[in-house]
């Protein structure tokens, strides 16, 4: 019974699993020139590479932020759908491996053995079914397919049928006097092995939408109710088990941050990381199998800098509800806080907040806060924040409230301006965190950084000439705070009970005249600045530690 379920495709279907045509050969060189990895380096057949279903870019596995797991994939597999971060509206990759046919597994096994021989300086293009192909599939079964490993050997006969059936389309055959039946690849160029997305698309098994999602079209008898993002645990098969079909929906994270992620709490902060293509010994690490199950050196990665200013998903109290576009937040019960993704440490900056809903008993404290501000308290509770309260217009810092303005209410649009004079003696480059440990959470890597609250409090100093000013519906309410502590400040929102506010980080402000009058920048301008600063900081770290960043220093 097992045997009959494993490979029932026709010769035509099998040969289309990997797209080999005359047109493919002619156009391969053109496409490969345009389809290099994020890192800019050429293809490397010794490691896993994934083909984007949208742009046909080949991406090295170790340049993918999504942690696929060392040893859990093989080069030359074709049973997957991958969307690169450049084609995804979320800014993060999506990947789904499907169940492979025995024909695909044979093809993958032969290709890997051929490449291994070439890497060792040998030329071997044909392999024994019994002595090499079947043992290879048995060894790497889980890396090739999502299909459960077979408990009997009945699938051996399926291998034989698949190889014979696809001779002259996928495989070559030769009878050897000593070794018996020998099989090789009909197309010797391993660079053209890839998923046949075109065939999947034509058959309805794959559909690419504008925002990079990949999903199947459902038949009339198999339509599902629409589900909202984050409410679906994935498609299921018989008996409610997760489906591994290529037609399954691929769930993408919203706006460049994983749906499931660690929160900053209990004295630790977590910073999303991505592979650093400029790190030394990157290729040696990529091709090494010795790192399976071992800690990855932090300097091989870098901080993933957000490409837009939004409310942070990880840097918030978990009970706060963030909208899908990450530009609105709703509170629940007592005061708690969320910070934005970007901070500022010098210059004059501005953002706006609109009070969307303010039920009876609800309140907000809005303003600017630093990274160590308590997320389970109102902004202005400690020395790390400066806030403006909706009730009575009170201003707060260090839990001391002073009258500042009239109250603000539902429908008001508030402006928040901060001015931080530059200090010549300070280094404003951001931390690289490359010396911090990397922790894995739900297939993504994060730098883990311990809070240094005591040390930070000890080193607080006043920044002369600094100020914070608040605006209501375009009108200044006066300077709220002067000579505040120096440091990096985030737009911060704290909410009591079920109030809802929306944020506007620019460029289309409701009251743009505030920027002109005060020569301020909108928070949206901070994006390119931070990308440049982070790149420079990473480069300086690698330069300063040149010669000391070695894989053999890590115990290999």
Curated annotation (Swiss-Prot):
Subcellular location as annotated: Nucleus; Chromosome
Highest taxon of source: Eukaryota
Disruption phenotype: Generally pupal-lethal with mutants showing a wide array of homeotic transformations. Adult escapers are sterile and show pattern formation abnormalities in legs, including tissue overgrowth and small supernumerary legs. In wings, the pattern formation defects observed include duplicated bristles and sockets, transformation of campaniform sensilla (a class of sensory organ) to bristles, ectopic campaniform sensilla and reduction of intervein tissue with increase of longitudinal veins and cross-vein tissue.
Primary site of residence: nucleus
Record GO biological process: brain development; chromatin remodeling; dendrite morphogenesis; imaginal disc development; imaginal disc-derived wing morphogenesis; imaginal disc-derived wing vein specification; instar larval development; negative regulation of gene expression
Region (Disordered): 1-27, 216-251
Residues reported in the UniProt entry to bind Zn(2+) 2: 52, 55, 84, 87
B30.2/SPRY domain mapped to chain residues: 288-510
Zinc finger (PHD-type): 34-90
Database matches in Gene3D superfamilies: 2.60.120.920, 3.90.980.20
GO cellular component terms attached to this protein's record: MLL1/2 complex; MLL3/4 complex; nucleus; polytene chromosome; polytene chromosome puff; Set1C/COMPASS complex
Keywords: Chromosome, Developmental protein, DNA-binding, Metal-binding, Nucleus, Transcription, Transcription regulation, Zinc, Zinc-finger
One GO MF term: transcription coactivator activity
Residue spans of biased composition, Polar residues class: 1-19
Residues that bind Zn(2+) 1: 37, 39, 60, 63
Tissue specificity field: In larvae and pupae, expressed in imaginal disks, salivary gland and fat body cells. No expression detected in central nervous system (at protein level).
PANTHER family: SET1/ASH2 HISTONE METHYLTRANSFERASE COMPLEX SUBUNIT ASH2 (PTHR10598), SET1_ASH2 HISTONE METHYLTRANSFERASE COMPLEX SUBUNIT ASH2 (PTHR10598:SF0)
Record text on subunit structure and interactions: Core component of several methyltransferase-containing complexes. Component of the SET1C/COMPASS complex, composed at least of the catalytic subunit Set1, wds/WDR5, Wdr82, Rbbp5, ash2, Cfp1/CXXC1, hcf and Dpy-30L1. Component of the MLL3/4 (Histone-lysine N-methyltransferase/demethylase TRR) complex composed at least of the catalytic subunit trr, ash2, Rbbp5, Dpy-30L1, wds, hcf, ptip, Pa1, Utx, Lpt and Ncoa6. Interacts with hcf. Interacts with trr.
Task performed by this protein: Transcriptional regulator. Regulates a number of genes involved in wing development including activation of net and bs and repression of rho and kni and controls vein-intervein patterning during wing development. Required for correct expression of a number of homeotic genes including Scr in the first leg imaginal disk and Ubx in the third leg imaginal disk and haltere disks. Required for stabilization of the histone-lysine N-methyltransferase trr and for trimethylation of 'Lys-4' of histone H3.
Name of the protein in question: Set1/Ash2 histone methyltransferase complex subunit ASH2
Organism: Drosophila melanogaster (Fruit fly)
